[in-house]
Amino acid sequence: MSSSKVAVVTGTNSNLGLNIVYRLIERSEPEDNLTIVVTSRTLPRVRECIDLIKAFVNTINRTGSVDYDYLLVDFTNMISILDAHYSLSKRYDHINYFFVNAAQGVYSGIDWLGAVKEVFSSPLEAVTNPTYKIQRVGVKSKDGMGLVFQANVFGPYYLIQKLLPLLQAGQGTVVWVSSIMSAPKYLSLQDIQLLESDVSYEGSKRLVDLLHSATYKEMKKLGIRQYLTHPGIFTSLSFFQYLNVFTYYGMLFLFYLARWIGSPWHNIQGYKAANAPVYVATMANPHFEKEQMKYGSATFRDGLEYIKTDEVDTTGCEDVYKYISNLKLQWDEKLKDQIKPTRIPL
């Protein structure tokens, strides 16, 4: 029996986001009617994404339809997030999948001297846990919050909280995409908005780990499954601006070398990186797969993909949850009069 399912994928225009959509379409029941809600900050990127997804759908056999919708949302703008909530609530009565693929950073370049030293002293570590990416410190959004904190953590969390009725109606699954680089060392609990951090991107992914750990049980009580994943290491389009043709292919060579000498995390292709996020959404058995674990996309030396799980150090999760919950209440109050009656259908 066919069903109608709705999937919202944030950051759809990224390498990982597109491949999450591809794999989701592949792994869904062929008779299901799917609606893919593409999200981006700009309309041209939305159109580009939808064209790519349509081309992919034309290469596979399925009896169910694939429909396309879009959502223009900027997770560093709370009014935009609230507008996204109203837009989705007006269009849909349920959401089945919500992928949090937010991955904004404030990079300013590469410490090339440091990179060369790392590559020669420890090549595997250099392409697994690099320390030579330069990130700006103290960058705030127009809302006055830490930009990376808002884009990758608080903004998506706020939207999910607003969409709980739709997720409940769809017996939905929320999939947080974290990172292999989300160790406790990247976050100070005295700097939850990451304004004093020179590793704000990694710190935001540590916050994702802790926020998931603090909330998945409550989500389960609502009939919503929530999983924590990471894509391993792959070629990300966002960092290409800092590479030339030589450094790009040098990076690829080191990625393949790392995989050959035994790293499970060098998936390299975005398609393989999307394995874990789509696996937990479509194939995970809620009676077997534990929501407190972190599910990673992994590959063997020959490129054969598999799922690798890790435990999460939850130290500080209640502190993070308390801080973000209080911040949500503050923004509820600030935004209560932002949506005008003209937005409500007559």
Swiss-Prot record:
Pfam families: adh_short. NADP(+) binds at L16, T39, R45, Y201, K205, S236. It catalyses: a 3beta-hydroxysteroid + NADP(+) = a 3-oxosteroid + NADPH + H(+). One of its GO terms (molecular function) is 3-beta-hydroxysteroid 3-dehydrogenase (NADP+) activity. Pathway: Steroid biosynthesis; zymosterol biosynthesis; zymosterol from lanosterol: step 5/6. Belongs to the short-chain dehydrogenases/reductases (SDR) family. ERG27 subfamily. This is 3-keto-steroid reductase. It comes from Kluyveromyces lactis (strain ATCC 8585 / CBS 2359 / DSM 70799 / NBRC 1267 / NRRL Y-1140 / WM37) (Yeast). The gene is ERG27.
